[in-house]
Amino acid sequence: MAETSLLEAGASAASTAAALENLQVEASCSVCLEYLKEPVIIECGHNFCKACITRWWEDLERDFPCPVCRKTSRYRSLRPNRQLGSMVEIAKQLQTVKRKIRDESLCSQHHEPLSLFCYEDQEAVCLICAISHTHRPHTVVPMDDATQEYKEKLQKCLEPLEQKLQEITCCKASEEKKPGELKRLVESRRQQILKEFEELHRRLDEEQQTLLSRLEEEEQDILQRLRENAAHLGDRRRDLAHLAAEVEGKCLQSGFEMLKDVKSTLEKCEKVKTMEVTSVSIELEKNFSNFPRQYFALRKILKQLIADVTLDPETAHPNLVLSEDRKSVKFVETRLRDLPDTPQRFTFYPCVLATEGFTSGRHYWEVEVGDKTHWAVGVCRDSVSRKGELTPLPETGYWRVRLWNGDKYAATTTPFTPLHIKVKPKRVGIFLDYEAGTLSFYNVTDRSHIYTFTDTFTEKLWPLFYPGIRAGRKNAAPLTIRPPTDWE
């Protein structure tokens, strides 16, 4: 079979060479035996170089014979053959290509055409190489067959390359649009910041006016008490001056006169010893004296963001137990009985929601996770499925950050976004900005940012708590809602 293929390859190469040789003959002049230059055609139909046929007929005045067929013509008729001239140029180019291919396609060992391909050595070989000891046990096929096979393989490679090229082209086009989109996003965020700080300034101005008014009231109150005390002290001073003059006068009187009413004078002097001299304190209230350090107004604004979150037992999965104050939740292996299967209750996903949801505004709460090895916290929208099997993702109405296997943190996006947290959080802070469409998570332990979801919220959002189903020693502890302590 291999020998037949080799013979077919040889025949194909010979046929191609013969066709090229015939073309070269047709493009040659029969007089000079070179490629035709300015080819012209005479009456008999043969073609010659214009210069060659002119020299051939140089001494003739009539009966001009053809150098090939000897047929004569009465007139010197030379018609340019431009089409043949173009073919001559093509033949020259083919001759050059043939020479180059011949030089490149010859076996360096046998100087024969490399018309075959060896699969094992992945190289072109000549006919002699193919039947030699080196390549005889190998699979050798005609070059055309190998070319076709590898052409098909390359074409198969071309499709994914074109797909990747299209992907890169689309990505590049998308990236080129992003500066404009970024500019719009930055401008939107800038306006949001300006608006928020304008509101902050307004509230601070209100607090400033309130505190300044209270300060002025306190000042007027102290001034009034100072005036009253000054008047009182003035009266006492006059009384004491009169008493001192009375005592001095008594001392200058004679015995009878001095002893007259002396008891009354001495009683007045005794009362002076117990007389209390009071001064009015000008010390301001503590809040005012410490105001530059405490930033009461700003603290008051921040406190307005803190949500008073409690757990709703009507939504709790039957394997969850809530504390009496409804601030803690833990997983138990034994399912609680006699719980009504209300529409609000989760029966597949062991989680619990808060009693209050949010449809606007900014809200902040903190969850103590301690040393638990498995948990998830976040929010879900009001319309989520609570009965059947579900995958809690943003697409299904859940925005969560979770921990599993003790050290694997992720934002439950599609696919999950791994979170590389340096310090294990003992407490997680959650900040919802409904209008801005952001839900941010913070590591309260080291005061670092964990992750922020960005979405468009259109329904009521409920704080969600999942204590984990692995009730091992460390994970048996509950999730607990804690009031933020940094505001005090």
UniProtKB/Swiss-Prot annotation:
The keyword Amino-acid biosynthesis does not apply. Keywords: Apoptosis, Coiled coil, Cytoplasm, Metal-binding, Mitochondrion, Nucleus, Transferase, Ubl conjugation, Ubl conjugation pathway, Zinc, Zinc-finger. A zinc finger (RING-type) spans 29-70. Residues 181-250 form a coiled coil. Pfam families: PRY (PF13765), SPRY (PF00622), zf-B_box (PF00643), zf-C3HC4_4 (PF15227). Residues 289-484 form the B30.2/SPRY domain. SMART domains: BBOX, PRY, RING, SPRY. A zinc finger (B box-type) spans 102-143. Pathway: Protein modification; protein ubiquitination. Residues 268-307, 359-488 are annotated as: Interaction with CDKN1A. Zn(2+) binds at residues 107, 110, 129, 135. It catalyses: S-ubiquitinyl-[E2 ubiquitin-conjugating enzyme]-L-cysteine + [acceptor protein]-L-lysine = [E2 ubiquitin-conjugating enzyme]-L-cysteine + N(6)-ubiquitinyl-[acceptor protein]-L-lysine. Belongs to the TRIM/RBCC family. Interacts with MOAP1. Interacts with CDKN1A. This is E3 ubiquitin-protein ligase TRIM39. It comes from Mus musculus.
